[in-house]
Amino acid sequence: MSDIGDWFRSIPAITRYWFAATVAVPLIGKLGIISPAYFFLWPEAFLYRFQIWRPFTATFYFPVGPGTGFLYLVNLYFLYQYSTRLEAGAFDGRPADYLFMLLFNWICIVITGLAMDMQLLMIPLIMSVLYVWAQLNRDLIVSFWFGTRFKACYLPWVILGFNYIIGGSVINELIGNLVGHLYFFLMFRYPMDLGGRNFLSTPQFLYRWLPSRRGGVSGFGVPPASMRRAADQNGGGGRHNWGQGFRLGDQ
């Protein structure tokens, strides 16, 4: 048990709380402590009955059962792996900036969910984070099932197809990829590559709540992966080795 505790405490703080909630809320629903009916994002209940908790619970809940358990575990792994890589990598020392990215993506996903009657938001938020990681490390070579290898920028779309095979739907993954692209475009591509204004800026109250541990620069300024490729490759990260021939989570 001490090994599990040490592993859990080693997870970056924001990812750790997100991971814990994504385990706890489905477990609460599975055990019947709270009816899962209260966890879904139902527009009528949220907008007209003022059940304001639903966007939060819909972000962490997933109906785990014989037909969905594998899909849940795969996406829980994606959450741990890529949220950890972002928080401890590109966002290292800047928890406020990382939390702002999650909040921006989450708000976009909630609005989309209300408009499209999407009742569960766990997969879209995870995929949006994975998409941002893939774009910041777009030229790294990742490995997938059966020894397939490709650039990281294609990983979100490969996973979209993979989740379609095991889950039968691509809407959640597609929404997550599009929201992740919106954040990446507004935060990086438009101001840095196209010379446009910066539309996204982390609010100062988040810096007061979660101060940067180094640098003290307001706003997130890590360049895209094309400028960081050598440093990242020297660090040895970025391999997605959990397919055939690799142990889950190997680097």
From Swiss-Prot:
The modification Phosphoserine is found at S201, S226. GO terms for cellular component: Derlin-1 retrotranslocation complex; Derlin-1-VIMP complex; early endosome; endoplasmic reticulum; endoplasmic reticulum membrane; endoplasmic reticulum quality control compartment; late endosome; membrane. The modification N-acetylserine is found at S2. It is found in: Endoplasmic reticulum membrane. Residues 32-69, 116-122, 167-170 are lumenal. Residues 2-15, 90-94, 138-154, 190-251 are cytoplasmic. Its main location: endoplasmic reticulum. GO terms for molecular function: ATPase binding; identical protein binding; MHC class I protein binding; signal recognition particle binding; ubiquitin protein ligase binding; ubiquitin-specific protease binding. Pfam families: DER1. Coiled coil: none annotated. Residues 229-251 are annotated as: Disordered. A motif (SHP-box) lies at residues 241-248. One of its GO terms (biological process) is endoplasmic reticulum unfolded protein response. Induction: Up-regulated in response to endoplasmic reticulum stress via the ERN1-XBP1 pathway of the unfolded protein response (UPR). The modification Phosphothreonine is found at T202. Widely expressed, with lowest levels in brain and heart. It is a multi-pass membrane protein. It comes from the Eukaryota. Belongs to the derlin family. Functional component of endoplasmic reticulum-associated degradation (ERAD) for misfolded lumenal proteins. Forms homotetramers which encircle a large channel traversing the endoplasmic reticulum (ER) membrane. This allows the retrotranslocation of misfolded proteins from the ER into the cytosol where they are ubiquitinated and degraded by the proteasome. The channel has a lateral gate within the membrane which provides direct access to membrane proteins with no need to reenter the ER lumen first. May mediate the interaction between VCP and the misfolded protein. Homotetramer. The four subunits of the tetramer are arranged in a twofold symmetry. Forms homo- and heterooligomers with DERL2 and DERL3; binding to DERL3 is poorer than that between DERL2 and DERL3. Interacts (via SHP-box motif) with VCP. Interacts with AMFR, SELENOS, SEL1L, SELENOK and SYVN1, as well as with SEL1L-SYVN1 and VCP-SELENOS protein complexes; this interaction is weaker than that observed between DERL2 and these complexes. Interacts with NGLY1 and YOD1. Does not bind to EDEM1. Interacts with DNAJB9. Interacts with RNF103. Interacts with HM13. This is Derlin-1. It comes from Mus musculus. The gene is Derl1.
